[in-house]
């Protein structure tokens, strides 16, 4: 009996010591005695409003040094638009440190997302302004492949003074591309790079300011078709002879042309080929 009483007394003594410690560490009592008085924010970010960040962090900081839930605060910050990742730490006696990594947009992806320079997809933030970005698209697992062809396409069309504004791959793997002068190009599924090389090589010969190209279809083994804008605004198939090798109806045969890929660097293209920056 005496042994039982001794054990019970020992447990009560331990509880009396442990409960205050647990209460303090969980913020049940004394939170106001160890308040987090300072917020220290770091990171290279420009689009996350400081007021919005402060409003998200403040409720967690009020719980005090011992009771603040760092992971919950970190998750809340990461849900803000433009935030790629966040780290939250506390430093004795009263500092809450927040490090924010912001998404750096590279392109629009599909209808409602963007692709960052790190190759991550994220929702398009609301009230997006002043962003002139290329329109890319495709299966989520194909982002590297889409970006690689985008970079190569820019190099191919750079000598013509044109840029690539749109490049998309559909669910079947078929490619389409839009140039800065409004020309829409259907590439198809196979040999996309070779087909674009052929078209870019002869594009200067097809220039006609009076009848600009509206659309090109490259889904042919040895050539392509071209539709031009007519004076009435409509488009039609190009049947006018060009100083190029003999052509089948509506198709320019390119077997006899010697093709070269221009050795160019792409300005303002943050992706390395074939992968993303790390």
Curated annotation (Swiss-Prot):
Q: Does the keyword Plastid apply?
A: no
The gene from which this protein is expressed is ftsQ
Return the Pfam families for the record: FtsQ_DivIB_C, POTRA_1
List the Periplasmic topological domains: 28-278
Where found, per UniProt? Cell inner membrane
Q: Which family does it belong to?
A: Belongs to the FtsQ/DivIB family. FtsQ subfamily.
Q: Kindly provide the name given to this protein in its UniProt entry.
A: Cell division protein FtsQ
Topological domains on the Cytoplasmic side lie at 1-6
Q: How does it assemble?
A: Part of a complex composed of FtsB, FtsL and FtsQ.
PANTHER family noted in UniProt: CELL DIVISION PROTEIN FTSQ
Q: Which InterPro entries match?
A: Cell_div_FtsQ/DivIB_C, FtsQ, FtsQ_C_sf, POTRA, POTRA_FtsQ_type
Q: Which GO terms describe its cellular component?
A: cell division site; FtsQBL complex; plasma membrane
Specify the species: Xanthomonas campestris pv. campestris (strain ATCC 33913 / DSM 3586 / NCPPB 528 / LMG 568 / P 25)
- Asked whether the keyword Cell cycle is assigned, the reply is yes
Name a single GO biological process. division septum assembly
Report keywords, A-Z: Cell cycle, Cell division, Cell inner membrane, Cell membrane, Membrane, Transmembrane, Transmembrane helix
Q: Which residues cross the membrane?
A: 7-27
According to its UniProt entry, the function of this protein is described as: Essential cell division protein. May link together the upstream cell division proteins, which are predominantly cytoplasmic, with the downstream cell division proteins, which are predominantly periplasmic. May control correct divisome assembly.
Membrane topology (UniProt): Single-pass type II membrane protein
Residue ranges of domain POTRA in the record: 34-103
């Amino acid at each position: 009996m005496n042994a039982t009483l001794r054990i019970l007394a020992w447990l009560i003594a331990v509880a009396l010591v442990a409960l205050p410690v647990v209460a303090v560490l969980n913020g049940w009592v004394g939170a106001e005695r160890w308040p987090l008085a300072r917020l220290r924010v770091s990171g290279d970010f420009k689009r996350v409003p400081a007021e919005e960040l402060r409003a998200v962090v403040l409720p967690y900081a009020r719980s005090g040094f011992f009771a603040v839930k760092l992971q919950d605060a970190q998750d809340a910050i990461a849900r803000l638009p433009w935030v790629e990742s966040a780290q939250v730490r506390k430093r004795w006696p009263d500092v809450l440190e927040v490090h924010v990594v912001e998404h750096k947009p590279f392109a629009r992806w599909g209808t409602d997302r963007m692709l960052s320079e790190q190759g991550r997809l994220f929702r398009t933030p609301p009230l997006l302004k002043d962003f002139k970005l290329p329109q890319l698209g495709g299966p989520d697992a194909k982002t590297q492949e889409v970006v690689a062809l985008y970079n190569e396409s820019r190099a191919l069309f750079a000598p013509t003074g044109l840029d690539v504004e749109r490049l998309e791959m559909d669910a079947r793997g078929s490619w389409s591309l839009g140039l800065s002068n409004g020309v829409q190009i259907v590439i198809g599924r196979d040999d996309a790079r070779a087909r674009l090389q052929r078209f870019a090589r002869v594009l200067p010969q097809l220039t006609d300011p009076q009848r600009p190209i509206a659309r090109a279809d490259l889904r042919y083994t040895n050539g392509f078709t071209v539709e031009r804008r007519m004076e009435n605004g409509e488009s039609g198939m190009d049947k006018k002879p060009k100083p190029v090798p003999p052509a089948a109806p509506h198709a320019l045969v390119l077997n006899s042309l010697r093709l070269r890929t221009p050795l160019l660097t792409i300005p303002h293209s943050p992706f390395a080929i074939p992968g993303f920056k790390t």
